[in-house]
């Protein structure tokens, strides 16, 4: 038994891990340090487990008790990682608030000094004008004469009036400051609620996938217990494996669709109606899309997945106004099987980014569409709160930015829905290397049968 299971879940699946991308730069180094510490713990955990395995079988009680204690240590370490991330997040939040308060205090002190100087200058100008006025009227006036003209009660009334005006202005200023502070807190709380909603949506996706993953693995275990060998066993095993990876594929696509604009509903490719997709487990026919890309343009798409994540190279986002959006032949959820004859089925993520960024001129994509809504009990249900807002995995106002029209580069680390059950997080990378006009040519539907699904999905268990 290894500590690799609970630790990554605590290090990446908790509230701290989910919001580390919006933290201060110091938080990034802290999480890197925590990741190194976690790897060292896993290594030591495995070494101790191997040592316990070398104990004589006659002393199995010692081995069992030792592994129970190691399980407790692993659980404690996972909780410690989670608490450390939470404390780090709170610390960075307090540091940011402290910086803001210091800045506001400095501005307030500076304004106070400036106002005092202005009042002093205004008083000097007032006295100067009064002396000039008396000189023009032929009256000799000094400070004593001016004071003598003012009776006692009038001076007191003037002071009371000034004090009353000061109190009224102070009340108005305090109310304005409180309103400003409350608006600032409201904005921060709304952002925090949006992050929590994203975590809930991601957790529901992960739980949904884990449920189907567990069902598939149970069927495989049952298959191992049956007396079945030869081609029939291999065919059934590959069929179960293909279903598991198909559900993983659909989960990633739902995560990708969660970040798209709600005002632009996702459209399936032409000819992909619900009835035909249901017959093929939601997998459409293989299509070829021809594009023309100028040298100064990017593809205008974002990709995710790869061999290391157990899913094919997927189109996770199509940027509006970019060549991929203008051509209309590519869709979110398409798995890129090949580009210009280069097979991408067994390609890792970075390799796919490199291959796509090197394409110039006329580009031929070989893609297959997978509909996440098909063959599922509640895929068509929108996750909405009481106000009617759908839970979205990504919110534009929470993302730090990133120009979708920039040149091709890999900004991995966006999708973390599957991080709780896979130590390698599915990384959504922006691949912006671009396309021009396109035409779409449907091909044979031979790859859409369930028996052949394992040719589209990697048989990688974790």
Swiss-Prot record:
Which Gene Ontology molecular-function terms are recorded?
Answer: identical protein binding; molecular sequestering activity; transmembrane transporter binding
Q: Name one GO cellular component term.
A: membrane
Q: Which CDD domains match?
A: bZIP (cd14686), PDZ_GOPC-like (cd06800)
Q: Does the keyword Hydrolase apply?
A: no
Entry annotated with the keyword GTP-binding: no
Domain remark text = The PDZ domain mediates interactions with FZD5, FZD8, ASIC3, GRID2, CLCN3. Also mediates interaction with CFTR and ADRB1. The coiled-coil region probably mediates association to membranes, targeting to the Golgi, and interactions with GOLGA3, and STX6. May also mediate interaction with RHOQ.
> Where is it expressed, tissue-wise?
Ubiquitously expressed.
**Effect on the protein upon substituting residue 189 to V:** No effect on subcellular location
Consequence of substituting residue 182 to V? No effect on subcellular location
Entry-linked SUPFAM superfamilies? PDZ domain-like
Give the membrane topology, semicolon-separated if more than one: Peripheral membrane protein
Domain PDZ, which positions?
288-371
Protein name, entry field:
Golgi-associated PDZ and coiled-coil motif-containing protein
Q: Which GO terms of type biological process are on file? A: apical protein localization; endoplasmic reticulum to Golgi vesicle-mediated transport; Golgi to plasma membrane transport; negative regulation of anion channel activity; negative regulation of protein localization to cell surface; protein transport
Coiled-coil segments, which residues? 83-200
- Please give the InterPro entries that the UniProt record associates with this protein: GOPC, PDZ, PDZ_sf
Organism in which the protein naturally occurs: Homo sapiens
Annotated site, Breakpoint for translocation to form GOPC-ROS1 fusion protein, chain positions: 419-420
């Amino acid at each position: 038994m290894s500590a690799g299971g609970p630790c990554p879940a605590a290090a990446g699946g908790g509230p701290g891990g989910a919001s580390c991308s919006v933290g201060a730069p110091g938080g990034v180094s802290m999480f890197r340090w925590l990741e190194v510490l976690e790897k060292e713990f896993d290594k030591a955990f495995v070494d101790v487990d191997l040592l316990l395995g070398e104990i004589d079988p006659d002393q199995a009680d010692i081995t069992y008790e030792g592994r129970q204690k190691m399980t407790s240590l692993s659980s404690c370490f996972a909780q410690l990682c989670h608490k450390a991330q939470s404390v780090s997040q709170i610390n960075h939040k307090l540091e940011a608030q402290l910086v803001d308060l210091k800045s506001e205090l400095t501005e307030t002190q500076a304004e106070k000094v400036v106002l005092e100087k202005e009042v002093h200058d205004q008083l000097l100008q007032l006295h100067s004008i009064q002396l000039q006025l008396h000189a023009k009227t032929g009256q000799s006036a000094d400070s004593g004469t001016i004071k003598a003209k003012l009776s006692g009660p009038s001076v007191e009334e003037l002071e009371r009036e000034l004090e009353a005006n000061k109190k009224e202005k102070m009340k108005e200023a305090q109310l304005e400051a409180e309103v400003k502070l409350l608006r600032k807190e409201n904005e921060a709380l709304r952002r925090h609620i949006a992050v929590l909603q994203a975590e809930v949506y991601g957790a529901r996706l992960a739980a949904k996938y884990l449920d189907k993953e567990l069902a598939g693995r149970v069927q495989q275990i049952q298959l191992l217990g049956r007396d079945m060998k030869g081609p029939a066993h291999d065919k059934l095993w590959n069929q179960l494996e293909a279903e598991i990876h198909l559900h993983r594929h659909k989960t990633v696509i739902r995560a990708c669709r969660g970040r798209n604009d709600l005002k632009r509903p996702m459209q399936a490719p032409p000819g992909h109606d619900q009835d035909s997709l249901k017959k093929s487990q939601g997998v459409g026919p293989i299509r070829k899309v021809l594009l023309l890309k100028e040298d100064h343009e990017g593809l205008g798409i974002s990709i995710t997945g790869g061999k290391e994540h157990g899913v094919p190279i997927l189109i996770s986002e199509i940027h509006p106004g970019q060549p991929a959006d203008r051509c209309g032949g590519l869709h979110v959820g398409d798995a890129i099987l090949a580009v210009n004859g280069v097979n991408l089925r067994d390609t890792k993520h970075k390799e796919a980014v490199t291959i796509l960024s090197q394409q110039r001129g006329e580009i031929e994509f070989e893609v297959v569409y997978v509909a996440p809504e098909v063959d599922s009990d509640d895929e068509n249900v929108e996750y909405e709160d009481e106000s009617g807002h759908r839970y979205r995995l990504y919110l534009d106002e929470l993302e730090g930015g990133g120009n979708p029209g920039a040149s091709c580069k890999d900004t991995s680390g966006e999708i973390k829905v599957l991080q709780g059950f896979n130590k390698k997080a599915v990384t959504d990378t922006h691949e912006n290397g671009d396309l021009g006009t396109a035409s779409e040519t449907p091909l044979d539907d031979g790859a859409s049968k369930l028996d052949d699904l394992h040719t589209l999905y990697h048989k990688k268990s974790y």
